[in-house]
Amino acid sequence: MSLENKNIIITAGGTGGHIYPALAIAELLRQNKANVTWVGTPNSMEASIVPEYFNIQFIKSSGVRRKGIIKKITFPLKLAYNTLKSRSLLKKLKADLVIGFGGYVSGPICLAAAQINIPVIIHEQNAKIGLTNRILAKFATTICLAFEIENLHKQFSSKQLAKTKIVGNPVRKDIVALNDKARIYTDSSTLKILVLGGSQGAKAINEIIPKLIQKSNEQGINIKVWHQTGKLSLEETKDAYKDISQNHIKDIAAFIDDMAIAYNWADLVICRAGALTVSECAIAGLPAIFIPLPSAVDDHQFFNAQNIVNNNAGFCLRQQQMTLENLLAIIKPLNQDRSKLEQMSKMAKKTLIKNSSEQILDCVKKILNNK
């Protein structure tokens, strides 16, 4: 069916892990002639990213997890107020359907939609269902998951399970295109490692990588690194590289503008295990060493990595396990036998769904066709 003149609301915010999958869907909806409006919170990441691409409306919203007693007491009142404001906004926008990708802003918008009989799709990017989506699952028309969730039958009712689909994480087209490209691991003397700390950086990873390169050189392993530090650690990390030859450094930057180029360049990635990073590495067929963020809610980054690890397409080290000895124990055999990297690349591509965006689009069309 055509989506022409259909008013679809995207709500997502807080982190890139929520925002970038939502952007991929929003773009596909626009290509299918839908009218797309984004709802986010002011003074947020989405407020700085989304306006370049889509019309965005704002409501104030905040979470309750790990907050003080006063905020926990006032939270229900604020949620009720924001939900009421969201109802007015949805009526003003003449919304036909709402898609929530997580973040606190999704709560009041999706609740408001359900209250006034507007269909709701929610998408969970992580291998652990977040608090907002656990609540919204009761009201959603369709529940989309990126990963198989352990013991989901204990978290969802039979009615909720019946409306649940595993669709993967939407990623950008230029990264999906890497899925069709075979990675060739030659007997090159250089092992190219991409290091990603996430948009805010990862201090522990940033500190150990320069030491890893020095130690590797001592053991005859020639590493070249492309290191994304995050904005907070750029100068400090650059200083840690000052005694390392430029022959071992492709670039050290706070951000990488074109991730498809970076993924295509690398033989191996060392990174956190945010949902989007895990999905992009898998789709790009890039073997990975995942270092889950220790403070991640419900340890979700550890669980995000497990599908790839269990399929022999990557490794996972807890941050306290991220020693030079453990990293070298992984890297040295891969450097000596590049066919292991090639096999890991093939397995990585099989672990995730690459047509996630199209599957979510299909959900949208089915719901609106039956509306």
Curated annotation (Swiss-Prot):
Pathway the protein takes part in: Cell wall biogenesis; peptidoglycan biosynthesis
The Gene Ontology CC terms held by the record are: plasma membrane
Topological category with respect to the lipid bilayer: Peripheral membrane protein
Gene Ontology molecular function: UDP-N-acetyl-D-glucosamine:N-acetylmuramoyl-L-alanyl-D-glutamyl-meso-2,6-diaminopimelyl-D-alanyl-D-alanine-diphosphoundecaprenol 4-beta-N-acetylglucosaminlytransferase activity; undecaprenyldiphospho-muramoylpentapeptide beta-N-acetylglucosaminyltransferase activity
Report whether Metal-binding shows up as a keyword of the record.
Answer: no
Residues bound to UDP-N-acetyl-alpha-D-glucosamine are: 15-17, 126, 172, 199, 256, 275-280, 301
Q: Does the keyword Transcription regulation apply?
A: no
Report the record's Gene Ontology biological process terms: carbohydrate metabolic process; cell division; cell wall organization; lipid glycosylation; peptidoglycan biosynthetic process; regulation of cell shape
Q: Name one Pfam family in it.
A: Glyco_tran_28_C
Which InterPro entries does this chain map to? GlcNAc_MurG (IPR006009), Glyco_trans_28_C (IPR007235), GlycoTrans_28_N (IPR004276)
Give the CDD domains listed for this entry: GT28_MurG
> What are the TM regions of this chain, as residue ranges?
none
Supply the EC number(s). Answer: 2.4.1.227
Reaction catalysis annotation = di-trans,octa-cis-undecaprenyl diphospho-N-acetyl-alpha-D-muramoyl-L-alanyl-D-glutamyl-meso-2,6-diaminopimeloyl-D-alanyl-D-alanine + UDP-N-acetyl-alpha-D-glucosamine = di-trans,octa-cis-undecaprenyl diphospho-[N-acetyl-alpha-D-glucosaminyl-(1->4)]-N-acetyl-alpha-D-muramoyl-L-alanyl-D-glutamyl-meso-2,6-diaminopimeloyl-D-alanyl-D-alanine + UDP + H(+)
Look at the named UniProt entry and state the broad enzyme category this protein falls under: transferase
Q: Where in the cell is it found?
A: Cell inner membrane
User: What's in the keyword line of the UniProt record?
Assistant: Cell cycle, Cell division, Cell inner membrane, Cell membrane, Cell shape, Cell wall biogenesis/degradation, Glycosyltransferase, Membrane, Peptidoglycan synthesis, Transferase
Physiological role: Cell wall formation. Catalyzes the transfer of a GlcNAc subunit on undecaprenyl-pyrophosphoryl-MurNAc-pentapeptide (lipid intermediate I) to form undecaprenyl-pyrophosphoryl-MurNAc-(pentapeptide)GlcNAc (lipid intermediate II).
Output the NCBIfam families linked to this UniProt entry. Answer: murG
Protein family according to the UniProt entry? Belongs to the glycosyltransferase 28 family. MurG subfamily.
Write down what this protein is called: UDP-N-acetylglucosamine--N-acetylmuramyl-(pentapeptide) pyrophosphoryl-undecaprenol N-acetylglucosamine transferase
| Protein source organism | Francisella tularensis subsp. tularensis (strain WY96-3418)
What is the gene called?
Answer: murG
